[in-house]
Amino acid sequence: MQNTIINSATEKLSPFKTLTAEQENLVNDILSFTTKHIKQDYPAIFTVYGDAGTGKSVVLAHLFNEIQVAARTKEDSPLYQTTNYFVVNHPEILKVYKEIAGDLPHLYKKDFTRPTSLINQLDKKDETVDVVVIDEAHLLLSRSDPYNNFTYNNQLVELIKRA
């Protein structure tokens, strides 16, 4: 039963799933925004709103695949050789994204992580990243959670500081 649920979710979030025209336009708008702001020294935020089940996660999965293809293969892209992560603070959804990454040449499982893991990893190495795509942002912590090794006050703020 668990594998059936994961396989169904994997199909729904696959970057090979056909997008509606509206979703495709949104992916293109976000890519345009990202390439415009990638070389700036300050963060830029693009927020996608929508009710549950409207396809936000599908859009983000397609978007991140496009970003990583550009980052890893398109020498003429402003995104070429950028360091990018997809963050989700839900273990089962993260598992689905990692499953998808295992099947695609330009997505690596290590590209997908939980917010606290990314924040702590970047702090440890004293590094920043170029692009962070956040799915299910309402699940980000807005207070310290030492039990889960999050010692700051707001995960969104901390991710923005590191991007």
What residue spans do the PLM features occupy?
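The feature marks helicase ATPase cores and/or their adjacent C-terminal helical subdomains
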Residues: 1-163
